[in-house]
């Protein structure tokens, strides 16, 4: 027996299968090209259903065994289109999205450096200004101390001149216009009025007996007047007098007072006149 050959396919059927395969390849290439050019776009929709005349004829397995291998290979290509795999993002896309961050970070770092530099400059200028002010204050403090020492020296010099003027003339000069004796100064240690007479009375010599008690010496009265005038002048000027000077001044005036010759003569006359009836002098 001779093997029976399958009937040759119809030419129109072979042409339709070839056209369908070409259409599927064209759609796949177009989808792949669109996906590469627009990666962010959604996945393309599957191709629409083809018209009935473009679809391949479904045959039974018995008929497929009898089909020519060349025709069957073309028919297998006409199967349902498979979606192409999504391409992985290439290295060219990452610099586009990541390139902005280095620029912004570098710009922010430059701004921070500029702000820090400006802050350091302001801080240094402020520190220099404070140092200059401290130097000026130190200079002013030294000048103030020098003026204060000079003022104290001038006060002592004025007090000495005032005491000598009172000793030579015995007149009190007029008070300055800016000094008021009715308002005593609390910040200065002015000697109390009661301290002067107590010192003079303690340092003065004992008065003589007899007629000398009735006639006090004129030198002591004049010295008391001068001392009181001196105290009034010092209190009026509002100046502090050195305690050593006052003690020396009072000591020089009262402790070493010389006796006058007329006082000794008066004492001898009194002793001569006051004699007892028996002719002997009265000794007190």
UniProtKB/Swiss-Prot annotation:
Region (Basic motif): 103-126
Ranges of compositional bias, category Low complexity: 26-40, 108-118, 193-222
GO-annotated cellular components: RNA polymerase II transcription regulator complex
Signal sequence region: none
One term of GO molecular function: transcription cis-regulatory region binding
Compartmental location: Nucleus
bZIP domain span: 102-165
UniProt feature, compositional bias: Polar residues: 57-67
InterPro entries: AP-1-like, bZIP, bZIP_sf
Region spans: Disordered: 1-121, 174-284
Biased composition (Pro residues): 1-10, 41-54
Keywords: DNA-binding, Nucleus, Transcription, Transcription regulation
Annotated stretches, region: Leucine-zipper: 130-161
Domain of life per record: Eukaryota
Any Pfam family the entry gives: bZIP_1
Function summary: Putative transcription factor.
Family: Belongs to the bZIP family.
Protein name: Putative transcription factor kapC
Protein's organism: Aspergillus oryzae (strain ATCC 42149 / RIB 40)
